[in-house]
A protein has these predicted regions:
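Short loop/turn motifs enriched for small/polar and acidic residues
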Residues: 157-161
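Nucleotide and nucleotide-moiety/phosphate-recognizing core
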Residues: 2-131, 141, 145-152, 162-167, ...
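Active-site-adjacent mobile loop/cap segments within catalytic or ligand-binding domains
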Residues: 170-184
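Conserved glycosyltransferase catalytic-site signature
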Residues: 137
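Conserved TIR/SEFIR loop-to-helix hotspot centered on a Trp-containing motif
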Residues: 134
């Protein structure tokens, strides 16, 4: 269900964000650009943010922002101006796009939520927290180097239930299994609910969610 019934009429997201606006929230989905990475575990951040933008009438269409190294959508939800971005830098340079957007739109780095895969968490779980280690995730490492660690993280488990004989970097670059694909609509629905809580609430949630049915 959508929150608002009409998309913004302007085609330029900068019209929404000028100096002095006191509550702008940045949503970041991590992934790698390119069709060959679509549908892979490592791109689950892109997947979830795409679904959020598609299902939220208040958010505008994706626009390419070459100067900010990302695809960007914007809108207003409740009393929060929202910018959603997908870095187009490849995963290990994601912080460049995040830093560019934060600087250009003068966003408080603590009003940021990053959606990303996490191999150390089993598929079916989403863990929410502010800060923490990168757990070897190069995208998170890049963002933290760029802006510090005081941002919210939506950590989507992609870990296998049983050990697999494959390197971690190869496993996350594989597409979701057929059984996992059947659960992705539940995943994106839960992430949308988490983002709604964050945008309408005062603080970033800190708990664990399960989306398997």
């Amino acid at each position: 269900m959508s929150w608002l019934t009409q998309r913004p009429q302007t085609s330029d997201p900068t019209n929404y964000y000028t100096v002095g606006l006191n509550k702008t929230t940045l949503l970041v989905g991590l992934g790698n650009p390119g069709k060959e990475y679509a549908g892979t575990r490592h791109n689950v951040g892109f997947l979830c943010l795409d679904e959020f933008v598609a299902k939220t009438d208040a958010m505008g269409d994706w626009m390419q922002k070459k100067d900010l190294k990302c695809l960007l959508s914007s809108g207003q939800i409740g009393d929060s101006r929202v910018i959603a971005i997908k870095p187009m830098t490849f995963m290990n340079l994601s912080g460049e796009a995040v830093q560019a957007v934060i600087s250009f739109y003068k966003i408080d780095p603590t009003r940021l939520a990053v959606i990303h895969d996490e191999l150390d968490i089993d598929f079916g779980q989403i863990r929410l927290r502010v800060g923490g280690s990168s757990a070897g995730h190069n995208g998170i490492k890049s963002v933290t180097i760029a802006i510090g660690e005081g941002y919210g993280r939506i950590r989507i488990g992609v870990g296998p239930k049983k050990p697999v004989r494959i390197k971690a970097e190869d496993f996350v670059l594989q597409k979701f299994s057929e059984a996992e694909q059947q659960q992705l609509s539940n995943l994106t629905r839960e992430v949308n609910a988490i983002l709604s809580e964050y945008l309408y609430g005062a603080q970033f949630p800190h708990d664990t969610r399960n989306f398997l049915v």
